[in-house]
Amino acid sequence: MHPAHLLVLLAVCVSLLGASDIPPLPLNLAQFGFMIRCANGGSRSPLDYTDYGCYCGKGGRGTPVDDLDRCCQVHDECYGEAEKRLGCSPFVTLYSWKCYGKAPSCNTKTDCQRFVCNCDAKAAECFARSPYQKKNWNINTKARCK
């Protein structure tokens, strides 16, 4: 092997060893997004929910601003239960599901997959039945979420 190739290979191996401390990406967010589209019939993008109220998106605290934000609070709590009761990692748990009309249906094998899929399905259905109020998107969470 050419010395330059060996040096590159060594650099890649060292980089990969260092990358083992990097937390995994939230792989199931894409699945959750498709589930949201299933439940709402594609009427609203899943991205519309990322910075909504006090709970939709990263983190969450305070009192939910409306029913839709409450859906996100319940979803956060459901993920917390998956971690606490079953030792699941909800953000990286992939599962199998199908869309029947506007109803997501979980079809999974393990307890973690089933629990996380049900968290997502219930949240997606809750999003679909709760009004979206633009005034609650991208709010000042420091001021409103106490």
UniProtKB/Swiss-Prot annotation:
Give GO MF terms, alphabetically: calcium ion binding; calcium-dependent phospholipase A2 activity; phospholipid binding; toxin activity
Cofactor(s) in the UniProt record:
Ca(2+)
Q: Which subcellular locations apply to this protein?
A: Secreted
Which InterPro entries does the record match to this protein? Answer: PLipase_A2, PLipase_A2_Asp_AS, PLipase_A2_dom, PLipase_A2_dom_sf, PLipase_A2_His_AS
Q: Which residues form the active site?
A: H75, D120
Name the record gives this protein: Phospholipase A2 OS2
Co-factor binding details:
Binds 1 Ca(2+) ion.
Q: Explain what the record says happens when changing K58L.
A: Almost no decrease in neurotoxicity, myotoxicity, nor in catalytic activity, no change in binding affinity to M-type receptors, no important decrease in binding affinity to N-type receptors
Q: Which PROSITE patterns match?
A: PA2_ASP (PS00119), PA2_HIS (PS00118)
Q: Which Pfam families match?
A: Phospholip_A2_1 (PF00068)
Q: What does the record note on quaternary structure? A: Monomer.
Q: Which GO terms describe its biological process?
A: arachidonate secretion; lipid catabolic process; phospholipid metabolic process
Outcome reported for the amino acid change (mutating G57S): Large decrease in neurotoxicity, 500-fold decrease in catalytic activity, no change in binding affinity to M-type receptors, 20'000-fold decrease in binding affinity to N-type receptors
**Keyword annotations from UniProtKB, A to Z:** Calcium, Disulfide bond, Hydrolase, Lipid degradation, Lipid metabolism, Metal-binding, Myotoxin, Neurotoxin, Presynaptic neurotoxin, Secreted, Signal, Toxin
